[in-house]
């Protein structure tokens, strides 16, 4: 690889042919690529980034999303949590976009080894990606806190109030990492493994503002 090429950061302004050519050349020469992505990857699919200024923050709710999407709020105001969650977080009609499909192609070609994502929408898998490490969980996995039975996102969307288990009546919780909750240790370890072994790390759609996820890129030792 090229010496000191640094990490490739997706940049809308940097679309001069030169950069694109360099980028494609790097992809061509790499066979152990890891993609690290955030909300920006899914905005083209119509999924709002609730951290952006024109994202969900300005929409009418009594509390900011960061408060509602916290463990404390979920425990204390579960019904209100679900009102927001159904309304804003379950974008089940969204379809994968070019980025999702391109990454799935790179994986199929044996070049891309893993997608590490901060997104919870499952669009990478919908596009055909197999090895997707979801740092913040997925809206498509929901489980009963009492018996552990799993439920689909559609089940949550179509339920009323606080969704309950149709087997034991227990409360259902989405398998997404809320504020105040820790990331899944295994997913983190897997992400560290893939990033530290990569020969190319592509970063897209993230401001790297969320820790500990953002700290993961420090494990990258490649040249590009």
Model regions: which residues?
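Conserved catalytic core of sirtuin-type NAD+-dependent deacylases
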Residues: 4, 8-224
């Amino acid at each position: 690889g090229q010496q000191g090429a640094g990490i490739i950061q997706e940049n809308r302004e940097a679309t001069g042919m030169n950069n694109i050519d360099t980028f494609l050349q790097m992809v061509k020469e790499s066979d152990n690529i890891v993609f690290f992505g955030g909300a920006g990857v899914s905005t083209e699919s119509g999924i709002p980034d609730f951290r952006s200024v024109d994202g969900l923050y300005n929409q009418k709710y009594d509390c900011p999303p960061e408060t509602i999407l916290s463990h404390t709020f979920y425990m204390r105001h579960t019904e209100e949590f679900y009102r927001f969650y159904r309304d804003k977080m379950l974008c089940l009609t969204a379809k994968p976009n070019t980025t999702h499909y391109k990454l799935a192609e790179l994986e199929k070609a044996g070049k891309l080894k893993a997608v590490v994502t901060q997104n919870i929408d499952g669009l990478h898998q919908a596009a055909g990606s197999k090895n997707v490490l979801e740092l913040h969980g997925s809206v498509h996995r929901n489980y009963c806190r009492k018996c552990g039975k799993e439920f689909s996102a559609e089940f949550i969307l179509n339920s009323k109030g606080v969704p309950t288990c149709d087997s034991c009546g227990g409360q259902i919780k989405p398998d997404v990492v809320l504020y105040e909750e820790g990331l899944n240790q295994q997913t983190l370890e897997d992400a560290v493994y893939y990033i530290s072994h990569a020969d190319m790390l592509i970063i897209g759609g993230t401001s790297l503002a969320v820790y500990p996820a953002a700290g993961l890129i420090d494990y990258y030792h490649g040249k590009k």
